[in-house]
Amino acid sequence: MEEYKAVEEAAMKFVKSVTEGDSRYAKELFIDQAVLFGYLDGQLEHGSIEQFYKNVDSVGADAGFRARVDVVAVEETLAVVRVLEENWGGRIDFTDYLLLLKMDGQWRCVAKAYNQNSDTIQKQK
């Protein structure tokens, strides 16, 4: 149970960054080589986690944002976390999956994949 709590606490850095619109907390969670994959408003985003940092910092905080962290699985050095996000940027709902590895005694995120709920997509013009 201790490891589940440690994984949850690590994932909360992700939530805190999105809540406050400040990527500095997420930068403590993600390794520099972390990758992301998912669709934002119908456009595929993939590549460096830097894109996530830019999105968080440019959208900023929203008082209506809510999130829930579910620790799906924990093994000795591997964990999977689901994060449900509501009202990011005042309009978007996401389901994120974070893949964490225990590195040098700390849970660090190596990959983020996400789905934007279809009823919150704004197509690019």
What are these regions (language model features)?
Residues 2-6, 35-93:
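Surface-exposed, charged secondary-structure patches
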Residues 27-28, 37-39, 110:
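Short, hydrophobic secondary-structure boundary micro-motifs
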Residues 1-24, 28-32, 47, 120-125:
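Short, low-complexity N-terminal intrinsically disordered segments enriched in polar/charged residues
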Residues 30, 85-87, 113-114:
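Short beta-strand segments enriched in hydrophobic/aromatic residues
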Residues 30-33, 40, 102:
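Generic secondary-structure microfeatures
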Residues 24, 28, 43-44, 73, ...:
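Flexible domain-boundary/linker segments
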Residues 95-123:
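Short beta-strand edge/turn micro-motifs at domain boundaries
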Residues 4-7, 13-14, 77-79, 99, ...:
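Generic alpha-helical hydrophobic packing signal
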